[in-house]
C-alpha cells in the first residue's frame, strides 16, 4: 500500500500531502477499525474481514461491487517456498505429506493468510479423482500432521522458516515467496508453484462512515481508483502482486508462472467457508484435535 500511496500523492495534482498507513494482519486490522481506528480505506487479506466491517455499518453491504474485479486490484496465489535446490523434491500437494517432510503454515483460526493456505490445500484435494469431503479431510489431517509448529500469524511462520530454519517448505503468498527467493535469499530459497492452487483475492474498500466524518470520501475513492490504473497496476507488479489488467500482467509474464487456479466462490464464498471450516467445532477443529 505504501508505494502506491506515495506515487498517488506525487501524481494526484494537489492531493493530500501525506497518507498515513497502518500495516498488520488482516483480521487484527479489521478488528482495530471495527473498534474505532479512524481508517478511511482498508486493504485487507480476505473479503470476510471487510464483510465484518459492513456488518456493523462502516461501509455498504455491497462494497465488493463498487470497484472493478470484486474490489480486488491485484491477486496472488498460494505457492511453496523451499530450501535452495529443493532437496526434498517438493513440486505438488501430495509431496507435502510424504514421510520426512515438514510443512510450515500458520494457524488458520488466527491467521487470514493461513486460511488461504488451508483452502488451497482443501480445494486441491476436492478436485482429485474420486474426491469427497471425507478424502479432503483426510488429506488436510495428514498435511497438518506434518506441521511441527503452528504459529499464530504469517509473519511468525515466515520467521520460523526463514530465520530459524524450521521445516522444509513454507506455504506462502506468491508475492512473499518471490520476495524471499529473489530479494531476501536468492542463495537460500526457491519458489515452487503447484499445478493447481487457489486464486487469492485481497480486496480494498472505502470505510465510508469514517471518510464522510473526516471529509475525505472523494480522496479515499480516488486513491482506490488509482490502484486500478496502469500506474497503480505496475507498482503492484513490481512488488510481486499479479495485476488484474491483462496488458500489465502480460508485461510481467516472466515474473508470474502459469498455473491453474480456483477461487473462493467455488468453495461457497467466505461466509460459508468461515462457518464450515474455521468456526468453533468446524472442519479444522476436527482435523487438528491434538
Feature-to-residue mapping (PLM):
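N-terminal segment of the mature folded domain
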Residues: 1-111, 288
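Solvent-exposed, polar/charged alpha-helical surfaces in well-ordered, non-transmembrane soluble domains
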Residues: 2-6, 31, 35, 51, ...
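Short secondary-structure boundary segments
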Residues: 46, 107, 174-175, 239
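Periplasmic-binding protein-like
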Residues: 71-80, 137-144, 151-152, 184-217
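Short beta-strand->loop
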Residues: 82-84, 99-129, 144-147, 193-194
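Short helix-loop capping/hinge motifs at secondary-structure junctions, enriched
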Residues: 85-91, 110, 123-131, 210-220
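Ligand-binding pocket segment of bilobal, Venus flytrap-like solute-binding proteins
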Residues: 128-195
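Extracellular/periplasmic juxtamembrane helices and adjacent flexible linkers that interface
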Residues: 211-290
